[in-house]
Amino acid sequence: MITGAIKNKVDKIWTDIWAGGITNPLTVIEQLTYMMFIRSLDEKELETEEFENMSGEKMDKIFPQSPIGQSMRWSKFKNNDPRDIYDVISQRVFPAIKNMKHGHLPDFTEQGEMIEIVDNTENDAEKDTAFARYMSDAMFLIPTPQVLQKIITGLDDLYEHDISDLDMQGDLYEYMLGKLSTAGQNGQFRTPRHIIKMMVELLQPTPEDAICDPACGTAGFLVASAEYIRSHYEDTMTNEQWEHFSGPMFTGFDTDRTMLRLSAMNLMLHSITHPEIDY
């Protein structure tokens, strides 16, 4: 549950971004989501490294193993000079997440040129994931190194002291989305979280189902369905069911590319890597 203290911290980050000149709430959420996503990639990598150390088993890595690739990790750059952080994120990390393929980030040469990941997938549908489609025109709009440093410090404070699990992260995201409570030009409305939860509990989705939201917005219903399935079936799901869960189970449509981009990242943050998100 989001406490008053957590809301105050989120509001402080929000105010810092507004003071930097970004006043559109949707743009603020979009930029914050990028930063949350970048941080989550490093967290997943740290978990993988910990598992490797305990088991001795080699695992696939998200980040390239070169010095430049490792410099793109949140834990590596977060304490650097703000200007250096800004350069790393704007010139390497952000272009890298836009070109992420199959859970891997591309590397860069010493001259700063991206080394594209070779895609051996024959099926075009598998190449063109929702994440790749809607990140292709994403823009990094955080205006200054100082604003970026405040966002990084604020998010670190939240995650290290207040956000303990996926449920809490979802609540945090829902609180930010609550700032979009007025209808947009295209009639976007945010469904309150308790209504979403009630509807999902009435549906009682199972790991065998296919779930579609024809007006998905930021994928609130799809994420809630995923959380319901996890809480009721996580311990009994087969490998085939987990594979179904990671993508084909969830389909969403919307008319706004920004909302679709937020959907793809929201689902990715909840470990749904290949959803069917489209116009």
List each model region and its residues.
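Conserved S-adenosyl-L-methionine
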Residues: 186-279
